[in-house]
Amino acid sequence: MPKTIIPLTLINLNDDGFHLLVEIVVYRENHLVVLDTGASRSVFDIAFTDQFALKPSTDDDLVADENFATTLFSTSNTVIATFPQLKIGRMVLSEYAAVALDLTSVNEAYEQLGHPKVAGILGGDILFKHSAKIDYKRLKLTLSY
């Protein structure tokens, strides 16, 4: 099974912990997402999905109702949309059904701390399926695909 190794960026949250950021590519544009091993599902900012994803999904496995996605940031109403292609390192996810949340407050907090804007949160659905290994010492994420 091929593997891809992706560099991680460590950001300090004013001595109140840290987050790891991962670069993804959508439509040949680079974007950052937060790596969150505690998030059961990856989520993307609703403005990001409005710009890059296709119309809302009708996938029966993913029901968009209130309080569907809980992350380290919030519990919120959700929308589901599909990204034709989402690239993480050399791994390409086709027709990825994405949960969309309003991450405005997250990005405002990051901005106040001098950190870059994030497009979403990389969660357990992708991390588990692709046997994620996080090397904190070397700041690398390894995914199998």
Located regions from the model:
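Pepsin/retropepsin-fold aspartyl endopeptidases
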Residues: 1-145
